[in-house]
Each structure stands twice: as C-alpha cells, then as structure tokens.
Amino acid sequence: MKPILTLALLASLATAGETQLFNGKDLTGWQGDPKFWSVQDGALTGKSTAESPVPHNTFLIWKDGEPSDFTLTLKYKMTPGDDKKFTNSGIQYRSKFMEPAKFIVGGYQADFEYGDSYSGILYEEKGRGILAQRGKQVVIKQGDDPSRPKLEVTGETGDSAEIQAGIKKDDWNEYKIVAEGNNVKQYINGKLTIDVTDETTEAPKSGVIAFQMHAGPPMKVQFKDIVLTTK
C-alpha cells in the first residue's frame, strides 16, 4: 500500500508542476552578484555591510524559467545591519531583465521590510511604482500616461494594521504569491495583503522570479523553503 500511495503522491505533484527552487546547499539555479549573495544556514542570503554597501538595487535571479500562472511560497527573514533598522527587500515575479550585467530586473514586486509601512504591498520595480497598498483590492486601469495608471480601489482584503501586526521581526515569515491571468494575490503568514487585477496593456504576463537586495544601509535578508507550483 505504501508504494502505491507514494506513487500517487508523486504523480499529483508532477501534475501540479511543483518545483523546489533552492537545494538548500548552494546557488545552483540562481544568478546574482557573489559579493552580496551566498548560502548561510541553509538559506539564500543577501548581505551588505558598511564596508561593502549595495550601490544600487541588485537581485538574485532564478535562471530556470519565466512562469506565467503559478503559486510561489517561501519563507523570509530580515536583519538590519545597523541601528537605523532600514531593511527593505522584495520578491520579483513576472519580471524582466533590465541590466543583466548588473543583475537588475524590473516588474511586479511583493514588497517587505523591517519597518511597518511596505510589507505586503504590490510595487513595480523600474516601472509604475506602488500599485496597491496593503489591505487593498485594486483594479489597475489604463491611464493617459502608461507610467501613471489609474488605481481603482474596489475593496479591502483586511485591516492593514492587523496584517502588519502578524508579521514577525527577526524571525521567519511565510510569503505566498498567486498569479493567474491578469490577477495577482499576495499573502503574508496566511493573510491576504493585496488582490490586484491589472487591466492595462503594460500588465506583465510572465517573467523571471528574483529576490532583491536594496541599496542603502547594511542589511541581511534570507530566503528558504521556496516552492513554485505552476498551473
């Protein structure tokens, strides 16, 4: 009975297209600036110091696909490198290479930080900026200027302060991103942070997955248990 159950489970996982994006040991399958990215304590780790600051936003990029419709789950943890406690990062998805030699990408970003303002929002790196604040359901409409779309708030996904209160500092949190058609949803620790439908011609349909190291004060950000399930 056990072999049959195991085979059935493997078949269901194969059908769902579940892929572990990180082997827990090294940077196989990923590309980024080795000055900042490594594996520490079984996690993908981006680290900057006062002596070695990040000059511009740089990214660790998954090399093995540009998924369209998917669910991505992972755990992340942040540690400020000084008493300023400024630590900002994000998960890029449906993104594109902007400056490959500098490991710079642009596109949708599931934002998070050590502070209380930006975790859970939808930001578009190298693009249209903040597209949805935490706790909002938004429809993005075409504007006269493609870089300045009309953001129509159509509802709430929850209370922003309550969502923030459930995010742990100096510990692991779980992020989930669900992208299907022109709709994207983001969750932190099981709470829906944004629900966005992008009706513009600029809406990305597919693209790379990447993790951000933000320019600025010293910081450390870590990622593990990274699972991509494609439709």
What residue ranges belong to the model's regions?
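Sec-dependent N-terminal signal peptides
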Residues: 3-13
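Carbohydrate-interacting regions of secretory-pathway proteins
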Residues: 16-231
